[in-house]
Amino acid sequence: MKFDISCLQPKEQASFALRALYEAAGCRKYHMGRFEEYGLYQENRSFLSSEQVITFTDLDGRLLALKPDVTLSIAKTAQPTPGETLRYYYHENVYRPSAESHTFQEIGQMGLELLGEVGETQVRQAVSLAAQSLAQLGKPWVLEVSHMGYLFGLLDALGVPEASRAALLAKLRAKNLHELRAAASAAGLDEAGAEALAGLMQLCGRCEEVLPRVEAACRNQRMRAAAAELNAIAAELNGADGSIRLDMTLAGEMEYYNGLVFQGYLESLPRPVLKGGRYDLLMQKFTPGAGAIGFAVYLDELDRLSAPLPPVQKQPTEKTMLNVALPKGRLGDKVYGLLAGIGYGCPEDYNATRKLVVENPAAGIRYFLVKPSDVAIYVEHGAADVGIVGKDILTEASADVYELLDTGLGKCRMCVAAPADYQDDPSRPVRVATKFVNIAKSYYASIGRDIDIIKLNGSIELAPILGLSDVIVDIVETGTTLRENGLRVVTEFMPISARFIANKASYQFKHREMDEMLEKLRAALAAKEEKK
């Protein structure tokens, strides 16, 4: 009797296909309980994606937790003997906080782990199975590969202090070239060192194009060993028709990954559906001398494959369309003028239409006209491929996007302002009025000052005048509004300008179109600057 799986949801079909794939590869199913001792997560919290865990006291008095992670439990219980390689796959739910809903989410995962003796053969098998997993999901896919050993080797060669490494890797991960250079300078690197880090941004593309440049940039044995492993992986997967891409800015968490790292994307989905890498450091906490590599497939992301298609789809005769989230207002007008001047204009009069979607299929461009504060949301969730947004909005939203270019447009700064006669009283918390709650919290936490936040949505300057707050945190451009209301700038702590951002998944499939637009936009901005 044959069972028709076509009636199942995409994630249900995927689970059948992946189970067959993993069992054929010699993996045994690992099943764990829903609860785990909280102490396991408390002692290993640096290996978790978030320290927030759902806990409860069991009937016998033990403090238990709903599992936020599967790999940690497998690493604890596997206990491979010397020379042995254990191969497990799993299909479990984990419970993690959502930055969007500010609640805990139940997340369906399916994945595999190879533990114990992990050499070149096991690494190649794990990455090959990751690629095969993506191929089972029924959409065009990309597997993005990098190596933490290569990144650590470069940081070693440049003499980067341990305390500065996490910040540099975060800027690399976001492809934020402008702030990477600033962070490199803050870490004590000279111009040559900063350029060496910036050069990683260029090590991105098809394996056969990028690997020679990866090898040429090696400075020590650690980098050469990583490059050799990447070469072996490329040879193993050479039949993937360009679906394997190297990207040396892909950096996993320092405390977790120590070797190969990779992420998988499906066309039309806004986030990675697969994440994995080598995590010997975690494994060796439980079994000294052992290694481990594995990955997880995020099945819940596949629910989007059964969602209705948006009304603006590519026609068969069209160029690949770049969907641009453009902020309404002065900034959007400036940006559109620049883009129209370099070949990305639309036949319709941008300023006259009341349409929210304007496009030019011949130029491969489509604009969504949105509220400035919503640009990052449209891009992060994949409704738009790229967008232009102020650094203030981007920071406040903590959007998980690539920050590809500082346009230099709309320059201003984030400031603390107060009445002219204001004196700070360290004996009590500062009352802060702002619409930038997260930015204000982060700034005052960095200087160790307690605050009470008063969230307002407009006319922020009125708050200290009426005694509602002691100070405000707000954007200042010329300072005229502050002066006319008897306020002064106390501290400037964040420069702001408009940034060109991209959805991480869209970048994998439309990077040529994005790079072409970026190159033209940089040239237009440079020409504009020269005219000043």
Regions found by a protein language model. Name each.
Residues E12-G33, G329-E348:
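Intrinsically disordered, low-complexity, positively charged segments
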Residues T317-K532:
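Domain-level signature for soluble enzymes in the chorismate/prephenate branch of the shikimate pathway
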Residues L151-G242, E477, G486-R488, K510-K531:
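Long, charged alpha-helical interface segments
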Residues Q52-H102, V375, E380-V389:
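Glycine-rich, N-terminal phosphate-binding loop and its surrounding beta-alpha-beta segment
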Residues D60-R62, L114-E120, S506:
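A generic structural motif
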